[in-house]
From Swiss-Prot:
Residues 440-551 form the OCEL domain. Interacts with TJP1. Interacts with the ubiquitin ligase ITCH. Interacts (via C-terminal cytoplasmic domain) with LSR (via the cytoplasmic domain), ILDR1 and ILDR2; the interaction is required to recruit MARVELD2 to tricellular contacts. GO terms for biological process: bicellular tight junction assembly; cell-cell junction organization; establishment of endothelial barrier; sensory perception of sound. Residues 45-58 have a biased composition (Pro residues). It comes from Homo sapiens (Human). The keyword Ribonucleoprotein does not apply. This is MARVEL domain-containing protein 2. The gene is MARVELD2. Plays a role in the formation of tricellular tight junctions and of epithelial barriers. Required for normal hearing via its role in the separation of the endolymphatic and perilymphatic spaces of the organ of Corti in the inner ear, and for normal survival of hair cells in the organ of Corti.
Length: 558
């Protein structure tokens, strides 16, 4: 009986849908097309499903007792001498490592990863992730008929792939621009200091290596003479001091090594600090840091100069090598200068010069940053406190001959006002709220012209508001000229009068004149005049840009 049931199941086609199919989702039951039809929407025979990589096994797969269940393959743990993590570390990352694994390494049971919820039928455009553990169409796991049912009711979006984010390869120009933006800091004086710091580290390492290579000579000296003057050379030392020499008590190599190590550690700290964002944003805006860095470089210059003098003095043993009484065949090994010692002396003096150059660059950086801060301060003052003369220039417009130019739409040269954002430098105090940058409405309302129709529309707007601007400009200009005349008259009035009544009368005149200047109607007209001037300048600039592009196109085709 079980064999007949299996044979009938084999004869059934894969595109047939039984009428008594249990549904897991209640939303699909409401569609009667799935209950009335025995087949799916597509009547074309479908290819058989792909076979699994390995046949299933186990006692639950076979319902008959006559047939022997398949023997489970002998699964043994794979023991490798070199772990895979080490291989992947030396091999590098791959884009899709699962494709390169052999069949025996494929895991048919997923890890303990949390499964994503199934896709909702009410949202046909939603795509479940690839690692979902359930069928996204509401059927059982891996059933082919449930996919056909969902495709029939909710067809897939053919344009679903358009919203995928594609990662394009950057061009050479984009890479060069990013490189210049990232490393343009190295072109400044602060960047030169960082380069000199790297040179100082290399030279300091050379000093340390060369001096350490011949430290055994110091041990031989102390083993032979101890920590005092050489035996029998006290008189020689006294004679040398009599003729301007000095005493020599032993090598001072530890002092040279301490100076080289201290300078190396200080230099690497300054170098790491200089490559940070804190150095660029905070320290460079301060007045004390460039001078502090100058002092550090001067101190290291003095230390290296002292170390170089001490090391040169050690090579000739404090001048004892110049005396025949000391320079005997027994002591000749102490007076012989090796090639590594000569290299150490060269490195010491070159490093000393590099630290001196770094100190001079720090002074140049201090002056450069002071000039930059002063320039930013002056620009901020010009933005915050515009002069009265600049305001008057914005409303100046000649009224003679304007009617004739209106008909020909001849635009007058109108310079646009420069709108610069407020610059904040230095440490931002807590609770500081920056002032918003107010952008005029006509900037977004009148973008770049693309067609001739837009040019005609811009031209009509210009003609319509140019007459209003002329009237306001003439009126405001007349009032400003009247104010200039009254200013001249008011300046001639006496500031201190002998009579009290005269003083009160002059005070009332000043107050009345101040009220006239601050009249809301006049200020509103003046503000409207400034707005129209900037707006017309913007529209005129857009039209000129479009005409220039069109002229280029005509010349190119001709």
């Amino acid at each position: 009986m079980s064999n007949d049931g299996r044979s009938r199941n084999r004869d059934r086609r894969y595109d047939e849908v039984p009428s008594d199919l249990p549904y897991q989702d209640t939303t699909i039951r409401t569609h009667p097309t799935l209950h009335d039809s025995e087949r799916a929407v597509s009547a074309d025979p479908l290819p058989p499903p792909p076979l699994p990589l390995q046949p299933p096994f186990g006692p639950d797969f076979y319902s008959s007792d006559t047939e022997e269940p398949a023997i489970a393959p002998d699964l043994k743990p794979v023991r490798r001498f070199v772990p895979d993590s080490w291989k992947n570390f030396f091999r590098g990352k791959k884009k899709d490592p699962e494709w390169d694994k052999p069949v025996s390494d494929i895991r048919y049971i997923s890890d303990g990863v949390e499964c994503s919820p199934p896709a909702s039928p009410a949202r046909p455009n939603h795509r479940s992730p690839l690692n979902s553990c359930k069928d996204p169409y509401g059927g059982s796991e891996g059933t082919f008929s449930s996919r056909k049912e969902a495709d029939a009711v909710f067809p897939r979006d053919p344009y679903g792939s358009l919203d995928r984010h594609t990662q394009t390869v950057r061009t050479y120009s984009e890479k060069v621009e990013e490189y210049n933006l990232r490393y343009s800091y190295m072109k400044s004086w602060a960047g030169l200091l960082r380069i000199l710091g790297v040179v100082e580290l290399l030279l300091g390492a050379g000093v340390f290596a060369c001096v350490t290579a011949y430290i055994h000579k110091d041990s031989e000296w102390y083993n032979l003479f101890g920590y005092s003057q050489p035996y029998g050379m006290g008189g020689v030392g006294g004679l040398g001091s009599m003729y301007g020499g000095y005493y020599y008590t032993g090598p001072k190599t530890p002092f040279v090594l301490v100076v080289a190590g201290l300078a190396w550690i200080t230099t690497i700290i300054i170098l790491v600090l200089g490559m940070s964002m804190y150095y660029r944003t905070i320290l460079l805006d301060s007045n004390w840091w460039p001078l502090t860095e100058f002092g550090i470089n001067v101190a290291l210059f003095i230390l290296y100069m002292a170390a170089a003098i001490v090391y040169v003095n050690d090579t000739n043993r404090g001048g004892l090598c110049y005396y025949p009484l000391f320079n005997t065949p027994v002591n000749a090994v102490f007076c012989r200068v090796e090639g590594g010692q000569i290299a150490a002396m060269i490195f010491l003096f070159v490093t000393m010069i590099v630290y001196l150059i770094s100190a001079l660059v720090c002074l140049k950086l201090w002056r450069h940053e002071a000039a930059r801060r002063h320039r930013e301060y002056m620009e901020q003052q010009e933005i915050n406190e515009p002069s009265l003369s600049s305001k008057r220039k914005m409303c100046e417009m000649a009224t003679s001959g304007d009617r004739q130019r209106d008909s020909e739409v001849n635009f007058k040269e109108l310079r646009t006002a420069k709108m610069k954002p407020e610059l904040l430098s230095g440490h931002i105090p807590p609770g500081h709220i920056p002032k918003p940058i107010v952008m005029p409405d006509y900037v977004a309302k009148y973008p770049v012209i693309q067609t001739d129709d837009e040019r005609e529309r811009y031209k009509a707007v210009f003609q319509d508001q140019f007459s209003e601007y002329k009237e306001l400009s003439a009126e405001v200009q007349a009032v400003l000229r009247k104010f200039d005349e009254l200013d001249a008259v008011m300046s001639r009035l006496p500031h201190h009068s002998e009579s009290r009544q005269e003083h009160e009368r002059i005070s009332r005149i000043h107050e009345e004149f101040k009220k006239k200047k601050n009249d809301p109607t006049f200020l509103e007209k003046k503000e409207r005049c400034d707005y129209l001037k900037n707006k017309l300048s913007h529209i005129k600039q857009r039209i000129q840009e479009y005409d220039k592009v069109m002229n280029w196109d005509v010349q190119g085709y001709s």
